[in-house]
């Protein structure tokens, strides 16, 4: 028997609303058994701040700066904290909860899916490994984030290199389907990132910023080589095929599917009601 075939979509650069709408549509189509499991890579037309499903914008985000910089802004359907998507490859994995290779628990499914990321980083020549909270205190810290910034600390089974988080991921389960998506940054501009978040005062902001450098890292900070998005795509194609033991088959959306995504993008992900919901 050959390997199981999964769909592979490389969307390229899209608008913030389109990116989130396509992930949701892929989840819906998976639930309706209209598509096999799917791996998707994408980028962003403009630098974009995404916030987690439960995040309170007025508490965490400096929207004046987001608007002043003309950045994109959209709320994800996954949890977690704020992510600035810029100079990165974003990935999503959409697979049924009852897939024979998918564990029932969120953390174990995270581990299985993230094996594709781990093998992708290894294909780039990076010594990546899983972060697993070692103590009860570490586990408690996962429940009580210190700031609204996503890369602030590793969570269960996130990928680290030299002790620093190198990929931020979030997962949701809806309609019997797992959607995991995340950010693989080539570079991180700390000043740009921290300007987008609200802090009690400048001193706290500077302290959080300096702590961040010891906890998170981007690919091009770790190597003398300067990788491109194209090289990342090739490496993570290989990584997901190896890590999940599948064959990726390129897929293009039909006109009907594209229309469905565009409609959802406009009606939901471009709406203030969704993006600024309390």
From Swiss-Prot:
Enzyme Commission code(s) on record: 2.3.1.181
UniProt miscellaneous comment: In the reaction, the free carboxyl group of octanoic acid is attached via an amide linkage to the epsilon-amino group of a specific lysine residue of lipoyl domains of lipoate-dependent enzymes. The reaction proceeds via an octanoyl-thioester enzyme intermediate.
Species this chain originates from: Bacillus cereus (strain ATCC 14579 / DSM 31 / CCUG 7414 / JCM 2152 / NBRC 15305 / NCIMB 9373 / NCTC 2599 / NRRL B-3711)
Active site (record annotation): 150
Any one GO molecular-function label of the UniProt entry: lipoyl(octanoyl) transferase activity
SUPFAM superfamilies: Class II aaRS and biotin synthetases
Annotated positions for site Lowers pKa of active site Cys: 165
Keyword Protein transport attributed: no
Any one Pfam family match given in the protein's UniProt record, by short name: LplA-B_cat
Descriptive protein name: Octanoyltransferase LipM
Oligomeric form and interacting partners: Monomer.
Top-level lineage group: Bacteria
Keyword check for Zinc-finger: no
Biological role: Catalyzes the transfer of endogenously produced octanoic acid from octanoyl-acyl-carrier-protein onto the lipoyl domain of GcvH, an intermediate carrier during protein lipoylation.
Higher taxonomy: Bacteria, Bacillati, Bacillota, Bacilli, Bacillales
Transmembrane segments: none
Keyword tags: Acyltransferase, Transferase
InterPro entries associated with the record: aa-tRNA-synth_II/BPL/LPL (IPR045864), BPL_LPL_catalytic (IPR004143), LipM (IPR024898), Octanoyltrans_LipM/LipL (IPR050664)
Catalytic activity: octanoyl-[ACP] + L-lysyl-[protein] = N(6)-octanoyl-L-lysyl-[protein] + holo-[ACP] + H(+)
Pathway: Protein modification; protein lipoylation via endogenous pathway; protein N(6)-(lipoyl)lysine from octanoyl-[acyl-carrier-protein]
Main EC class the enzyme belongs to: transferase
Family: Belongs to the octanoyltransferase LipM family.
Domain annotation BPL/LPL catalytic: ranges: 33-248
Biological processes annotated in GO: lipoate biosynthetic process; protein modification process
């Amino acid at each position: 028997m050959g390997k199981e075939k999964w769909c592979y979509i490389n969307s390229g650069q899209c608008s913030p609303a389109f990116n989130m709408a396509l992930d949701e549509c892929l989840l819906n189509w998976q639930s309706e058994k209209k598509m096999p499991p799917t791996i998707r890579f994408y980028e962003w037309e403009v630098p974009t701040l995404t916030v987690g499903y439960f995040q309170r914008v007025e508490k965490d985000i400096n929207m004046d700066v987001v608007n002043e910089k003309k950045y994109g802004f959209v709320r994800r359907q996954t949890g977690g904290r704020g992510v600035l998507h810029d100079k990165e490859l974003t990935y999503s994995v959409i697979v049924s909860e009852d897939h024979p290779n998918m564990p029932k628990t969120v953390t174990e499914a995270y581990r299985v899916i993230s094996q594709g990321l781990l093998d992708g980083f290894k294909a780039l020549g990076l010594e990546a490994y899983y972060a697993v909270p070692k103590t009860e205190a570490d586990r408690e810290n996962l429940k009580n984030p210190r700031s609204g910034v996503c890369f602030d600390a590793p969570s269960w089974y996130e990928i680290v290199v030299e002790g620093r988080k190198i990929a931020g991921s979030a997962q949701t389960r809806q309609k019997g389907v797992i959607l995991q998506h995340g950010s693989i940054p080539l570079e991180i501009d700390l000043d740009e990132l921290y300007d987008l978040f609200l802090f009690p005062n400048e001193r706290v902001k500077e302290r959080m910023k300096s702590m961040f450098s010891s906890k998170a890292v981007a690919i091009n900070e770790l190597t003398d080589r300067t990788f491109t998005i194209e090289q990342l795509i090739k490496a993570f194609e290989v990584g997901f095929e190896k890590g999940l033991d599948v064959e990726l088959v390129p897929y293009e959306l039909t006109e009907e599917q594209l229309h469905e995504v565009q409609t959802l993008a406009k009606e939901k992900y471009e709406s203030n009601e969704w993006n600024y919901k309390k």
